[in-house]
């Protein structure tokens, strides 16, 4: 193959022509240009594609402030060779330049498209220095942080660059091994340096010559030659005519490309130079500069805008496992097409996997820049991923903290301090607060899906239940300071002495009202009003839990544990078993110390004790009734749902409870199988038996002042007095009959069919009288008018009649 040496004209104003002297008896080194010295006119390009020549950089090459460093990919592994484009100057802004995260082809393509559109090329930004040094083993380490793409001083130029490819030979076919025919081993040594430049020169020939992108190499010794004693030969760029034979490509390794001159303003960025070979520094590059020993054989890499890759074959360096693939850039799709050649992998070689490169858009490029560089130094006028290495970290001034809504809404008469009840924050008075001073309403997050069972800890006032007509409507949650006002910090009193606020609901809101004059330096402590405490099922007073034995408990857990000590685990006496049978005496062995009732389990006894203490935590959602036993609540809910699963087999009546059905069946059978444990009397209904047992067990008796009847409860006596006074407040709307209690009126309405005749009126009145007697828990005696038998209860007398 014929080679023609051309001089490389990098001639900005006041710059001499570049030459390089030989080292170790080597030929002088000179660069070639891309055509004529004059700048080309913007004419149409007849042929799609134009090669770019890569000149050799001589050993005496000094700093060039107006030369452009061009890195072309040497394969799929982001390695390349530098070249200079002479005679075409484009002014670049002074350094430093912001770093752009983009691919190599992303930056070279706009220059090509700008020329095709008859527009001046855009300005490009170049890294400061990229050093890649390699040996036969190609020990590459990914150290992107060590590559500083900026130049701190104002000297912009091309530092001494090296393109050294030692001991290499190219055979006639690109896919064959590139080692010499004499059989000795091939060593590859490469060193590349990139520098920022301020001007670009690119004269292109117009005489119809086809330019080649050519790299020539020869075989050398296996051992690495020292930098000072290395032999050098020129690296030349050949130009061939348009009618170059096709076999010249195969034998010479040169890829011809036809067409007029094409400007290639090129940008090289560090994101595709992620690999760096250790062992060579900038000082080493300045001290020892060596070139390449080349032969007539050549390795060619072509770059074109639209090139047929079918005629290109991959060139493989088998000794180091590096494959040079033909690369084409499409100006239409803006995609990079890689060759389909494979990479030769050996045990002692570095393998490069062909990537599929995709052009990035401008938006993603900006996002990458924002992710990588977060700190902007105004003195350096550039961005850094962390603190500036020269000026250090910047000074940040934080915003003034904004307090929460709860703290900002605190009245000026109050302050926030440590609470005395154990909470973190409490509300204290700064001045005297008079009695009947109201605060509110309480502001918080409303929740309509809050279940009753979820509020298990009654001591924590983070959830406030709001009822409407006895039904839970919603809850106010006071857990977030940004959603609540200052009232969320008011704590609950532990006893009556601490309480100075009363919390009560009004119109779906919670208000606090002072119950006494509160002097300064006192904490606001609330407790619920009587009605609200009944609604939510808590004690009406915040006193400590006091047992009948005199023991004071500060918490319900302590009180519950104390009640266990009162449980007497003993069997009832044989005389008290009576007709209940042995099964009852064995099952009900847990007796209450406050009443004669016994239970089959200690848990039932605990629930029973809660009834003695007035604690009813289980509240009905449909009405205001509360229960100490959850089973009673479940039974009560059947009243609202109308569920009656127990039906009488002898009539059409149905009942919500099994016990009610059993009591009803006695009416049909007439059996008296319930016997008193203290006497021999028998009863049909369990309710009658309980009423009778009170005669033997209850000591306190209330006597009617108008008659000799005795009563166990005051409310029963009041109802009895109404019978003496003739007060019947419950009137039937159908027949105008009146009754003492609502219960009797309800029972009458089930059978009332309207106004009754006069003959049946006395009978109905007699029934009413007997019903009135049922209300009295009397322990007195009644004489039968038929005989002299004496009965202790009215119902027993009625049954006797």
UniProtKB/Swiss-Prot annotation:
Domain of life: Eukaryota
Any Pfam family matching the protein: zf-C2H2
SET domain span: 412-529
Biased composition regions of type Acidic residues, renumbered to the chain: 762-776
SMART domains: ZnF_C2H2 (SM00355)
C2H2-type Zn finger ranges: 545-566, 618-640, 646-668, 674-696, 702-724, 730-752
UniProt keyword annotation of Zinc present: yes
GO cellular component: nucleus
Gene Ontology annotations of biological process type: methylation; transcription by RNA polymerase II
Cleavable signal peptide: none
Subcellular location: Nucleus
Sorted UniProt keywords: DNA-binding, Metal-binding, Methyltransferase, Nucleus, Repeat, S-adenosyl-L-methionine, Transcription, Transcription regulation, Transferase, Zinc, Zinc-finger
GO molecular function terms listed in the Swiss-Prot or TrEMBL record: DNA binding; DNA-binding transcription factor activity, RNA polymerase II-specific; histone methyltransferase binding; methyltransferase activity; zinc ion binding
Family annotation (InterPro entries): PRDM4 (IPR017124), PRDM4_PR/SET (IPR044404), PRDM4_Znf (IPR041493), SET_dom (IPR001214), SET_dom_sf (IPR046341), Zinc_finger (IPR050331), Znf_C2H2_sf (IPR036236), Znf_C2H2_type (IPR013087)
Broad class of where this protein is predominantly found: nucleus
Coiled coil: none
Disordered: region residues: 751-782
Family label: Belongs to the class V-like SAM-binding methyltransferase superfamily.
Xref: PANTHER family: PR DOMAIN ZINC FINGER PROTEIN (PTHR16515), PR DOMAIN ZINC FINGER PROTEIN 4 (PTHR16515:SF2)
Role, per record: May function as a transcription factor involved in cell differentiation.
Name of this protein: PR domain zinc finger protein 4
Naturally occurring in which organism (per UniProt): Pongo abelii (Sumatran orangutan)
